[in-house]
C-alpha cells in the first residue's frame, strides 16, 4: 500500500480532552459550551463529519473544517475465531499497523483489548509483540479510536490495555486517552471497567496512581529475579523487591485488587517451589492471580504446561487463601491470545465501508449503555 500521500496537518480533535477542546474553541472566539456539543457528536454518535453536527452553526462547521479534523480507524482486516473472538487490524495514517481484540464474555458482553504502541520496547521473551521492538507511541486519538471502531460491531463492556505495547512507556498519551474514555461527554466508561497492564515500570506505576484511576494488572510471570531477568528484561532495572513495594503503595479503591498475571511456562516457572514463592511474594497485597497457560507461537521455543501442572499450581494458591483464576486463552486459532499480537493479519478484507457505516450505533439515546 502506498502511504506516501500528504498527511492532513489539521488538528485532530480526537487527541483533545474536554478541557483542551474547550480552550481550542475559545481560541477561535467560540462559546465554551460548544466543546461538549462537539464531544458528544464524536463519541456518543461516533460522527466524524462536522457537517453532520446539526446543532452547530454553519459558520462554526465551516471554520472547524478549515482548522480541525476528526480521525477514525477503520479495520483494514478482521479475523474471527471459532470461539467468537474477533481480531482487528488497523492501518494508521503513517502506514504502521496495530491490532485490537474483541473478546466475547458471558451474557452477550464483550471485553476489548487495545494497543498503546506500535511494537514494544520491553522485549519479554515469551511475547510475540516484543520480538519486533518499538516503532512509536500511539496518540490519544489512536488509542481511543480502537474503542470507537469496535463499538460499530456492538457494545464494549470492559476495556483492557493489554494489546501491543507497554502502556506506562506511553504514560502521557495513555492518561489522556483514559480521561477521554471516562468523560461523560466522551465514551463515558466507569474506571471500574478499565484495566491497564504493565510489565513493571515502577516510577510510572507511582505516577499513574497519582494522575488517573484505573484497575492495575502487573505482568509478573516469575517468583525469582533470576528467572524474571531472563523472561522480562525490565526486571534488571526494577527487580521484584522494588516492584512489590510499588504494588503495596498503589492506591486501590474499596473492594479492588491488583491483578497479577502469571504466564505459566513449562519447566520455567510452573514448579511447586514457584507456587510456594508466589504466595510469599504477594503476602500483604490485595491480590488476584490470573494464571495464563503459555500460548505457543512461532517466535518462541517455550511450551505450554501440562493440564496436571496447571491444576496443581492453581490448587496450591487456592489452598493458601489466594484468589487464583485460570484465565481462558480465547482467540488462539487466530493468534489473538495473550502474547500473540504482531500487527499483521492475512485474511480477506472486511465488509464494505458503507456497510460498516450503516452498522454504526447512535449512542445519543442515553449514556453509558455499553457499561
From Swiss-Prot:
Chain positions covered by the region annotation Disordered: 345-371
Domain annotation Radical SAM core: ranges: 106-333
Gene3D superfamilies: 1.10.150.530, Aldolase class I
Major subcellular site: cytoplasm
EC id: 2.1.1.192
Amino-acid positions noted as binding S-adenosyl-L-methionine in the UniProt annotation, renumbered to this chain: 165-166, 197, 219-221, 295
Cofactor field: [4Fe-4S] cluster
Protein location: Cytoplasm
GO biological process terms held by the UniProt record: rRNA base methylation; tRNA methylation
Misc. remarks from the entry: Reaction proceeds by a ping-pong mechanism involving intermediate methylation of a conserved cysteine residue.
Family: Belongs to the radical SAM superfamily. RlmN family.
Protein known as: Dual-specificity RNA methyltransferase RlmN
Species for this entry: Syntrophotalea carbinolica (strain DSM 2380 / NBRC 103641 / GraBd1)
